[in-house]
Amino acid sequence: YTGMIEGAMNLPWQSIPFAQIMSDRFGLPCKITNDANAAAMGEMTYGAAKGMKNFIMITLGTGVGSGIVVDGKVVYGHDGFAGELGHTCAVRGENARPCNCGKVGCLEAYASATGVARTAKEIISSTSKDTLLRALNIDAITSKDVFDAAEKGDEVAKEIFDFTGTILG
């Protein structure tokens, strides 16, 4: 691969020679990959997948991705996008959410951190149930806020995660 960030769905970066910038800055060779592939390499080398030759590492965060390992090697595909689960269509129909990639109904629009926050906003706006989340600015709620409320037994927060989990599978 070229070391170039061709396009980042969640960042305003296009055609950034990131590996070269880092090499120039630190005087060391640099290679780049996405977070899911890096996580898979880390698990294969140091973590729960140590010694495994075939596995999939799912990542949920700003996006939804996976690092796929076959015969002890990360699978990149012909264009480097193997494992990009986030842009798999998970919801169809006129109410499917738009995604940053330009499509609608992508898994990432529901199961990412921003997707969970959006679900929280939608559910809180459509229910009169008590929830710890009402004490927060509805437009500033994060997935961490939902997690914290769920940890405290908040039923609406649990409903938000149930919805997300159903879509995630």
What do these predicted regions represent?
Residues F55-T59, G65-G67, P98-N100:
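Short glycine-aspartate micro-motif
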Residues F81-G86:
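Structural signature of FAD isoalloxazine-binding scaffolds in flavoprotein oxidoreductases
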Residues M4-G7, V74, G80:
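Short glycine-rich, Thr/Ser-proximal phosphate-binding strand/loop in the N-terminal lobe
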Residues D35, G61:
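Active-site glycine-centered loops adjacent to acidic/histidine catalytic or metal-binding residues
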Residues Y1-S15:
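Short beta-strand-loop/turn "lid" adjacent to the catalytic site in phosphate-handling enzymes
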Residues N34, H78:
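Active-site flanking residues adjacent to catalytic metal/cofactor-binding acidic residues
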Residues A40-T45, S66-I68, H87-T88:
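Adenylate-forming
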Residues Y1-T2, F18-C30, G42-K53, V74, ...:
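ATP-binding/phosphotransfer module of carbohydrate and carboxylate kinases, centering on a glycine-rich
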